[in-house]
Amino acid sequence: MEYKPKFHMTVEQNIFVAKRNIVDYIWKSARLEGINVTFPQTYAIIEKSRVNGVDVEDILKITNLKHAWQYVFDSIGKPMNLDFLCNLHSEVARDEALMWGKLRTGNFFISGTSYVPPIPKADEVQSAIQRLLTIPDPTERSIEIMLWGMKSQLFWDGNKRNSMLAANKIMIENGCGIISVPNECLEKFNEILCDYYTNDTLEQAKEFVYEHCIDGIDFTEQQDDEEDEDLTPDM
């Protein structure tokens, strides 16, 4: 299967899309982690408004995601390497994980699968990143880096969030859109992810993400349509 870019935006346009929909992306990331929070509650937390019915730990995770996204925006155009992943994790899992910003140093089990990820070694992680960065197509490269990060479980916690944000750095830098799992696909995504962990079904996982989990805007097509209708773009 080919993983040609679904969207062809400039970096600035892709950043605009990400910032415009940031609450939605953070909300969906929270839901992916099993946080039972509504969109209005997520918005209130991000805006530092008073919110009821959400655990303090969950508020922290959502706030950390906000800071992590800002770190991604600030890192556009900078190298993708182990230092970036660790610095990103410092934002994703601050005051939440056993350690943040440092590679996992012990074994643990992943719920729903018999797969036990090996303890990561810095040199092997950096080699894997360099190998993945050679994938020619940026969309495929982003998806593979995300799935690799999730399966590798580089950190004690926050691996899904960290891996998806790292993938979105590459997506944005290439104007390819944003990877985000829709709520209606959460159950299926987790099922496919568990199968990937257990049976190494990488292609199946890649295809699902490509078909169902990429968001964006085709600005060129939209602008052409508006010009045909003699309308002024509302931008």
Where is each model-derived feature located?
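FIC/Doc superfamily catalytic core
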Residues: M1-M235
